[in-house]
Design a protein with these regions (language model features):
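Extended carbohydrate-recognition surfaces in non-catalytic/accessory domains of CAZymes
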Residues: 1-125, 178-187, 191-194, 589-602, ...
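Substrate-binding/catalytic cleft of secreted carbohydrate-active enzymes
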Residues: 222-224, 327-330, 337-598
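An acidic-aromatic loop/edge-strand motif
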Residues: 82, 87-89, 94-103, 149, ...
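Active-site-adjacent substrate/metal-binding segments within catalytic domains
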Residues: 78, 82-118, 123-129, 133-140, ...
Length: 918
């Protein structure tokens, strides 16, 4: 098929598309608008004719005329990879094609789509595609309509002159790649096709084209209208109509303000002679004062998450039900903010965020990460290639504009993000300035401004917030240590730092920078982490250190976990595939399996941990009182929650962001649980919001008292020391420094243990572990003696030394065996120098049975840096139930802070808390 190669043409981003506008659904009258029936919307979703081609050369010329010979059927919306065409590919930063901008490979797969639709009216007809990856050509009844790209934005065509009464043929040719694909290098499975809704809006000849609604906290609504017909307005609250008229400025007395805790919305109807548009709007105002982010004149904290459109069965295609399930789960786990990583979500999802109460960072459909992945490339040298190239100015600006203009009326959108990981340069600086000129009511963000390309001095004056990814919490301390004087200086080649980015800390008063650069750097901006606590596999850990700082520093206003869900493909039979499982190159393995929830939305323990870390209250114990902190920004604590303290209901009347003291009940352990006080969109009254366990006295049940009465029979033969008592028989192996028999409790010799299965987030340190041969440790015994009195005492000096390596550990242990069979172990360990951190250290027992009882942190897996979602208690469980089925097998199921553990055959206790797994 011969077509114009717009997919390789930077000067042709769109042909015959309508101007960008706000998202809305027109209705015929106010009653239909009130019901949300959208009777002017003709939905074209459904089963379409489809054929997949590996190259445009294979597409028949008469396709656009309606020839469907040999075509299959495909659901629209969908991704063609999820329907059995092409193959799946996951790549993080590397482009899936040669870097040769703006050109894409000649053999560029494409999908030919064809459907029929009926027309029986004289309305103007606007054909809408809410999401097509990557670019597409459109024909109606054999006539060319237009071309568009930008996968995650709406493209609208006026097809009025192409449509006839009766049956009409719509043909769409979608390409896998286009020049825009260089700007869509997001970390995700790469999928293609018409993946969002397709519909026609039937509209009168004269109608509203666009509008912009701005509110303030004094109750004023300002409306800008682009319309060729008269417009009037009706405003309603939950009780009914409060305004009707044609003024574009409406004032509401004592408005109820919108925030994430009380997402109150008014309903505004835009009424013309033949059409009505309904908008849900909230009164809210976001601003910065003295480096602090305020909403409605109150400082706020965004406790957020990054969310991709991802489903193991449907891919990018996400229904309202799927999206609403995500939002409900987020709110159930105390998440109040969302970053649309790294592209605009479906437009109706933003409306849901208004209703559920989320602070949204709306991100443009831009990521250019592949430019930093070249051989010899880096963030400082090649990351900004397209960001600096004037040929790409319009393409970058177009994507930013489409994001902002579409969602400009969404109350939940508080911050515009220019994109993600695209380097920095003049193209983003121009786009940022356009955003500030177009919309001064919201904040601007772009994390990649942290990177400075050689030969360029970044201008970040149009960016309102300072943003980093995965900065060490010590970096955050430094940022707030002496703001405005000791500052982070972006430099092209970087010198290494605790953040790891290209820059260094400098004292402005002592630096030799130019006046303009100094003035810009002296501006103290609010700080956020647009990505933190990488949730891959058994993680994230160390959340508390970040959340402590979120509340310690007024200027630290937000942190967004990476990321919401595991990306994987459901292959049936409980199998999930990830990168490389489809034989694709390049691929980045299981790096996409990095969510707080499994692909099917079962919560990981990491989500439970995050829920506890960001719960809307904190309680500390001092002497005989409890200090209760309300971490809501707007709500009185007793308006949202009721508490049970050791099972007794209580309410704490603490003001927003306030603290108050209350008497603490008696007891060694005080358990405080918080419950939702009323029904919400995401949970019923009585839903548990979080808990706090106060350990007053750590009185743990001990092992039975040592009984010295009784007799021993001790013998030595070769390497074995055999100890027999009334009801036990132990054999100690002098060659390993450990027991090889403990009656029937173990099935093989006890082992010294250093190695464990690496977690996904161990991917870097794991190389050092393997190079150090931690998985090959052998015990070498220097000396082993024993003595018999009323006990048996074995003293052993041994070392752990792998083949090839020098000594890793020197161990001296005293074992004392009592007449009742209890074994006491005292061990001192000296670790060798210049070794990587040890995965773990302890003893490995090979026991029988399933049942386990322990006193420690449970019931979920727990670790020294990941146990907020667990509490100290005695638990009865099984080995199977302690297993956490991560998609890629790894370390799991450990229990931190254990005082004792008991299987069917053995019991271990310690004066010092320990961890165990089974």
């Amino acid at each position: 098929m011969q077509i114009e190669k717009y997919y390789n043409d930077l000067n042709t981003l769109h042909i015959n598309t309508e101007e960008n506008r706000a998202y809305y659904m027109p209705c015929s009258d106010i009653e239909n608008a009130r019901k949300g029936t959208n009777d002017r919307k003709q939905v074209l979703n459904g089963e379409w004719n489809f054929m997949y081609y590996t190259c445009i050369d294979d597409v028949p010329e008469d396709f656009k005329d309606g020839n469907t010979d040999g075509f299959d059927k495909i659901p629209v919306p969908s991704c063609w990879q999820t329907q059995g065409y092409d193959r799946h590919q996951y790549t993080n930063t590397r482009y899936p094609f040669p870097y040769n901008p703006p050109y894409v490979p000649y053999d560029n797969p494409c999908g030919a789509y064809l459907t029929h639709f009926e027309s029986d009216n004289d309305y103007r007809k606007y054909l809408n595609f809410e999401g097509v990856d990557s670019c597409f050509y459109v024909w109606v009844n054999g006539e060319f309509v237009g071309y568009s790209q930008v996968s995650h934005s709406t493209s609208e065509f006026d097809i009025t002159d192409k449509v006839k009464n009766g049956d009409n043929i719509l043909c769409v040719l979608v390409f896998k790649w286009c020049d825009g694909s260089y700007l869509e290098d997001q970390d995700k499975f790469r999928m293609s096709g018409i993946f969002r809704d397709v519909y026609i809006l039937n509209r009168p000849q004269k109608h509203i084209r666009d509008y912009k609604i701005e509110t303030d906290i004094q109750g004023k609504i300002n409306i800008e209208i682009d319309s060729d017909t008269d417009v009037s307005f009706v405003l309603e609250n939950e009780k009914g109509e409060i305004y009707s008229g044609d003024s574009k400025t409406i004032t509401v007395e004592k408005p109820i303000l919108w925030n994430a805790e009380y997402p109150y919305l008014y309903t505004l109807y835009l009424v013309t002679e033949d059409e009505v548009i309904r908008e849900k709007i909230g009164f809210r105002e976001i601003k910065i004062d003295d480096g602090i982010v305020f909403l409605n004149n109150k400082p706020i904290k965004m406790k957020g998450v990054n969310r991709h459109d991802s489903d193991p069965v449907t891919g990018y295609t996400i229904s309202r039900e799927q999206a609403e399930k995500d939002l409900k789960l987020m709110k159930q786990h105390n998440i109040n903010a969302l970053r649309t990583s790294h592209y605009p979500n479906a437009p109706w999802l933003m409306q849901l965020c208004d209703e559920y109460g989320f602070y949204v960072i709306a991100e443009s459909d831009i990521e250019i990460h592949g430019t930093a992945s070249f051989f010899g490339g880096s963030q400082a040298v090649t990351f900004g290639l397209l960001a600096q190239n004037p040929d790409w100015e319009n393409a970058i600006l177009d994507r930013v504009q489409r994001n902002v203009i579409r969602d400009k009326n969404r109350t939940s959108v508080c911050i515009w993000s220019l994109g993600n990981e695209g380097g920095y340069g003049v193209n983003f600086e121009k786009a940022g300035r356009w955003v500030k000129e177009y919309d001064s009511t919201r904040l601007t963000h772009y994390e990649s401004s942290m990177w400075q390309m050689e030969g360029h001095i970044n201008d970040t004056s149009m960016l309102d917030v300072e943003s980093t990814m995965y900065a060490d919490y010590k970096w955050i301390d430094k940022y707030f240590e002496n703001p405005g004087e000791v500052v982070w200086h972006r430099v092209s080649l970087g010198k290494g730092s605790e953040y790891g980015g290209a820059g260094e800390w400098i004292n402005l008063s002592e630096s030799k920078l130019g006046k303009k650069e100094k003035e810009q750097m002296a501006v103290v901006k609010p700080y956020m982490q647009c990505e933190f606590i990488h949730a891959m596999g058994n993680g994230p850990g160390g959340i508390k250190e970040y959340i402590d700082r979120l509340y310690r520093y007024d200027g630290f206003f937000g942190a967004f976990a990476w990321e919401w869900c595991d990306h994987a493909i459901d292959m049936g039979d409980s199998k999930y595939f990830y990168g490389g499982d489809f034989g694709e190159y390049p691929n980045d393995g299981n790096f996409c399996v990095d969510g707080l929830v499994y692909p099917d939305r079962r919560p990981h323990t990491g989500l439970l941990e995050y829920k506890q870390a960001i719960k809307p209250f904190a309680i500390k114990s001092y002497s005989n009182i409890m200090v209760v902190e309300n971490r809501y920004d707007f709500a009185e604590l007793d308006d949202k929650l009721y508490f049970e303290v050791n099972g007794e209901r209580m309410e704490f009347d603490v003001p927003p962001r306030g603290k108050k003291s209350f008497p603490r009940p008696n007891g060694d352990v005080v358990m405080v649980k918080a419950y939702q006080k009323s029904d919400t969109l995401w949970a019923k009254k009585g839903y548990e919001v979080g808990f706090e366990q106060l350990i007053v006295n750590d009185n743990v049940p001990k092992l039975e008292p040592v009984n010295a009465d009784g007799s021993f029979e001790v013998s030595e033969q070769g390497r074995n020391i055999t100890i027999k008592g009334n009801n036990f028989e132990y054999i100690f192996d002098k060659s390993t420094g450990n027991f090889k028999k403990l009656s029937d409790a173990v099935t093989r010799s006890v082992e010294w243990n250093v190695w464990r299965a690496p977690t996904d987030n161990d991917r870097n340190i794991m190389r050092d572990w393997i190079n150090a041969d931690y998985h090959r440790e052998q015990s070498y015994v220097y000396d082993c003696t024993y003595d018999v009195t009323d006990t048996v005492t074995i003293k052993c000096h041994n070392a752990l030394i792998p083949v090839v390596q020098r000594k890793h550990m020197d161990i001296e242990t005293v074992w004392t065996i009592y007449a009742n069979g209890i074994i006491d172990m005292q061990s001192s360990v000296k670790v060798g120098e210049n070794l990587p951190v040890i995965p773990r250290f302890g003893l490995r027992f090979f026991t029988k049975g399933e049942n386990v009882k322990y006193y420690g942190y449970g019931p979920y897996e727990s670790y020294s840096d990941k146990h907020l979602c667990t509490y100290l208690d005695e638990f009865n469980t099984t080995v199977s139930d302690m297993y956490e089925p991560y998609i890629k097998p790894q370390e799991n199921g450990s229990h931190f802070g254990t005082r004792y553990v008991e299987t069917e055959n053995i019991r271990v206790s310690s004066d010092t808390p320990f961890s165990f797994s089974a």
